[in-house]
């Protein structure tokens, strides 16, 4: 049994001039035990101008969260520069390369994923999801953005995570949403 604590689904979208990120509250120990149902995996950073969410090993994610926030301050809130510098440090450090987590970061202008391999990815369609329910949330979000375009970014973020929670056993309905 894998005894690491894991946190799961995060979804983010930029749509109609707004951006929203949603995350569920479930933390799982291994494959069978829910340790916490109300974790807050989506947070505001840098004077509330940046929203970040994590999926993966909880301890690893908090380490990356703290490192990313330090990079944000070091580069005066420049989201892409902070993400790239974090990724460079992540790739270049033997200990950091062992971390099992991913981040989604966004501000009013950009949406990025910082992957577990130290890559920075900007989605083509301003929509992204990570974690065990990520593919379900991403599918729902893309369908809603395409076929229900009058919905707000917040509404799409909510519905996408609800869909993932209905399907993925590692995602629950305790959803936190942050909007910019």
From Swiss-Prot:
GO terms for molecular function: metal ion binding; threonine-type endopeptidase activity. Allosterically activated by HslU binding. GO terms for biological process: proteolysis involved in protein catabolic process. It comes from the Bacteria. Keywords: Allosteric enzyme, Cytoplasm, Hydrolase, Metal-binding, Protease, Sodium, Stress response, Threonine protease. It is found in: Cytoplasm. The active site is at residue 8. It catalyses: ATP-dependent cleavage of peptide bonds with broad specificity. Its EC number is 3.4.25.2. Its main location: cytoplasm. GO terms for cellular component: HslUV protease complex; proteasome core complex. Pfam families: Proteasome. Na(+) binds at residues 165, 168, 171. A double ring-shaped homohexamer of HslV is capped on each side by a ring-shaped HslU homohexamer. The assembly of the HslU/HslV complex is dependent on binding of ATP. Belongs to the peptidase T1B family. HslV subfamily. HAMAP family: HslV. Protease subunit of a proteasome-like degradation complex believed to be a general protein degrading machinery. This is ATP-dependent protease subunit HslV. The gene is hslV.
């Amino acid at each position: 049994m894998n005894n690491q604590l894991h946190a799961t689904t995060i979804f983010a979208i930029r749509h109609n001039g707004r951006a929203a990120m949603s995350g569920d509250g479930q933390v799982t120990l291994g494959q069978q035990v829910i340790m916490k149902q109300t974790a807050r995996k989506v947070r505001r950073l840098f004077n509330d101008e940046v929203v970040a969410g994590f999926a993966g090993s909880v301890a690893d994610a908090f380490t990356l969260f703290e490192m990313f926030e330090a990079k944000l301050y070091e580069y005066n809130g420049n989201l892409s520069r902070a993400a790239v510098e974090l990724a460079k440090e992540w790739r270049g450090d033997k200990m950091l390369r062992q971390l099992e987590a991913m981040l989604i970061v966004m501000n009013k202008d950009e949406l990025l994923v910082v992957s577990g391999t130290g890559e920075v990815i900007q989605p083509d369609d301003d929509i992204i999801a990570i974690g065990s329910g990520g593919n379900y949330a991403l599918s729902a979000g893309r369908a809603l953005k395409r076929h229900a375009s009058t919905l707000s970014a917040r509404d799409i973020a909510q519905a996408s995570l609800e869909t993932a929670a209905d399907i993925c056993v590692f995602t629950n309905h305790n959803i936190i949403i942050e909007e910019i």
